[in-house]
From Swiss-Prot:
Protein name, entry field: D-aminoacyl-tRNA deacylase
Cited HAMAP family: Deacylase_Dtd
GO biological process terms, semicolon-separated: D-amino acid catabolic process
Oligomer and partners: Homodimer.
Gene Ontology cellular component annotations, sorted alphabetically: cytoplasm
Amino acid sequence: MRVVIQRVSHASVTIDGHCKSAIQKGMMILVGIEETDSREDIDWLCKKIVNLRIFDDENGVMNKSILEDEGNILVISQFTLHASTKKGNRPSYIKAAKPEISIPLYEQFCKDLSCALGKEVKTGEFGADMKVELLNDGPVTICIDTKNKE
């Protein structure tokens, strides 16, 4: 699984002209799922996300997790995170999982992340054409890949 985490002042997702979900201060997370992802990837990633210290403490130092900061999370499915640009100029998405694999994993990820956060995680709609708006705070943007844990 690959995620791009952005610390935001606010974020929203619109589908067919209607706001599906919106959050105030917190994280907007793009998540891409590949064929080899599993429950273990979800477990590791959820723990990592809720404990990631990217929010400012009283001294302005990034030292607080989203749990401590009481922030919100908006999760958007994003198969293009698995784009390969190795050959030519047109990205290949061969590593992105097919819907029959990615939808259940995406739903489980959102459910488990809600449990880890202790409140509802807002989402987009899997496979929909979405318009995502956000105000990146910092900016702070973190990329995590469960197959390359750095």
